[in-house]
Amino acid sequence: MHIMEGYLPVTHAIGWSLAAGPFVVAGAVKIRKIVAERPEARMTLAASGAFAFVLSALKIPSVTGSCSHPTGTGLGAVVFGPSVMAVLGVIVLLFQALLLAHGGLTTLGANAFSMAIVGPWVAWGVYKLAGKAGASMAVAVFLAAFLGDLATYVTTSLQLALAYPDPVSGFLGAALKFGSVFALTQIPLAIAEGFLTVIVVDALAGKVDDKDKLRILAGEAR
């Protein structure tokens, strides 16, 4: 998913950075409030960031000029809400760009918009809808992580198509081509990420009722 350094036109790089900015600011405010009101949630915040860092660093090269990998943002999104992952995701992407040459500084805004904003918002929305539909916590978390991951790659496909539309079929044709290439590796990875996220939630929360697990992780219950 990480679009490599210098791959996007300058105007696109700036535009995606400006689009991501307000979400990151809102996330910083949310994190500050969480830490002030629930200091015990700091460990889970750190674990959410580490989970995203490790999973999104497992990259599989793709011929689209990007790569495929799990995103790991679903965990933090379902526990703390999507705005928190905007900040954690940017930190993850920045470290990966500087230390692993994964992504880049000029494409940080675009990568953040797809992985740290769209993915977490979709994951959070799916989790809420699944819960209201009567799904168990495990099913809701799985669907959230699975669809949040896929939403990230759909967004990246659209970003790449906007930058490089197909000469014949235009934006839609390019988006379908980028998306189809990602899908070969990403659908299996998204399924695996869904199962792994459920396992991690269970491991971090311990042996408590499903309805209390996320509240405990978020520092809202003891």
UniProtKB/Swiss-Prot annotation:
GO terms for biological process: cobalamin biosynthetic process; cobalt ion transport. InterPro entries: CbiM (IPR018024), CbiM/NikMN (IPR002751). Keywords: Cell inner membrane, Cell membrane, Cobalamin biosynthesis, Cobalt, Cobalt transport, Ion transport, Membrane, Transmembrane, Transmembrane helix, Transport. GO terms for molecular function: cobalt ion transmembrane transporter activity. One of its GO terms (cellular component) is ATP-binding cassette (ABC) transporter complex. The chain crosses the membrane at residues 9-29, 43-63, 75-95, 107-127, 134-154, 160-180, 181-201. Pathway: Cofactor biosynthesis; adenosylcobalamin biosynthesis. Residues 30-42, 96-106, 155-159, 202-222 are cytoplasmic. Its main location: membrane. It comes from the Bacteria. It is found in: Cell inner membrane. It is a multi-pass membrane protein. Residues 1-8, 64-74, 128-133 are periplasmic. HAMAP family: CbiM (MF_01462). Belongs to the CbiM family. Part of the energy-coupling factor (ECF) transporter complex CbiMNOQ involved in cobalt import. The complex confers cobalt uptake upon expression in E.coli; can also transport nickel with a very low affinity. A Cbi(MN) fusion protein has about 70% import capacity, but the holo-Cbi(MN)QO complex cannot be isolated, suggesting CbiN may destabilize it. Forms an energy-coupling factor (ECF) transporter complex composed of an ATP-binding protein (A component, CbiO), a transmembrane protein (T component, CbiQ) and 2 possible substrate-capture proteins (S components, CbiM and CbiN) of unknown stoichimetry. Subcomplexes composed of CbiMQO can be isolated from membranes but the CbiN subunit is not isolated in association with them, suggesting it is only loosely associated. Expression of just CbiMN in E.coli confers some cobalt uptake. This is Cobalt transport protein CbiM.
